[in-house]
Regions:
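Non-catalytic cap/lid and distal C-terminal segments of serine-dependent acyl enzymes
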Residues: 20-287
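Sec-dependent N-terminal signal peptides
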Residues: 4-16
């Protein structure tokens, strides 16, 4: 009898493993009136999404420059890593949404002239669409944002601009925007900024320099978001991330800051992703 039970369990293992697998869809789209085009996105649905009626927390996971909504799927291996974290209990079951910010114009922000309004699209159209389409808990405590490089910059600015919407933010190897006004010179050479006025440039700096935004954060916002900043010791963006950490320390903004061995590549970010999922899950739980 014991041998029969053992054999049955062995035969059932592939079925059990299959049942514990989430799903990824990486070529979905929604129509944007703000951007006047269809915008693609990818989504990870946890293993029990199709067999339950429950709603889930959500992570908005932002890609870097040169990638699109498929980056975290193809290179970041979100399906394998999220499934493993959920199965092992280091992360709670969640939905992961990965928007495209590489089509039309690259980036997560409104451009300086205001004729490309990605940030407005994200908050006014994309988030409401996603959270109405999927079974997502629509409260701040169940919503987080993370991203790498350009997406790390988006993570910083989105959570700084909307601390009422995100419980946690986890920028990886983040592009921290112009670090000072002199640094703005390299930004003005970008498309759409060549003819910007001095006032437009100064306004852009104040709204997109992460160290400057941290420096000017109101006291009542300093504990609204749980922060975790992660950057490799061989990453060319180490300076900006270190300066942000220093400003946060000076201004009494609670956060975690890690410099680990590694560079600006997918090997580093795949290693970071389980930590991201665990950290944001702490906020999703009651604590």
């Amino acid at each position: 009898m014991k041998k029969q039970i053992s054999l049955l369990l062995i035969l059932l293992l592939p079925i059990i493993a299959f049942a514990q697998t989430g799903k990824v869809f990486d070529n979905l789209s929604m129509k944007s009136e703000i951007l006047k085009m269809d915008k693609k996105y990818a989504i990870y649905l946890p293993p029990d999404y199709e067999t339950s009626d429950r709603s889930y927390p959500v992570l908005y996971l932002l890609h870097g420059a040169g990638d699109d909504q498929t980056g975290w799927v193809q290179f970041g291996e979100i399906l394998r890593i999220a499934d493993k974290a959920i199965l092992e209990g280091s992360a709670t079951a969640m939905i992961v949404v990965m928007p495209d910010a590489n089509t039309g114009q690259r980036g997560y922000f409104n451009n300086i002239k205001g004729d490309w309004r990605y940030e407005d699209f994200f908050f006014e159209e994309f988030m409401p669409f996603v959270e109405e389409t999927y079974r997502i808990k629509g409260e701040k405590r169940y919503r987080a944002v993370a991203g790498l490089s350009m997406g790390g910059g988006g993570t910083f600015v989105f959570a700084l601009r909307h601390p009422e919407l995100f419980s946690s933010a986890f920028p990886l190897s983040a592009s921290c925007g112009p670090l000072n006004m002199d640094d703005m010179k390299r930004y003005t050479s970008r498309a759409g900024m060549e003819d910007a006025t001095e006032l437009e440039i100064e306004t852009y700096f104040k709204k997109h320099s992460v160290p400057e935004m941290m420096k000017n954060m109101p006291d009542d916002q300093k504990k609204q978001v749980r922060w975790f900043i992660d950057c490799g010791d061989d990453d060319f963006l180490y300076e900006g991330n270190s300066l942000v950490h220093i400003e946060m320390r000076k201004n009494g903004i609670p956060h975690e800051f890690r410099i680990r061995e590694g560079a600006h590549n997918w090997t580093y970010w795949r290693q970071s992703l389980p930590v991201v999922l665990s950290f944001i899950s702490d906020a999703f739980h009651q604590y």
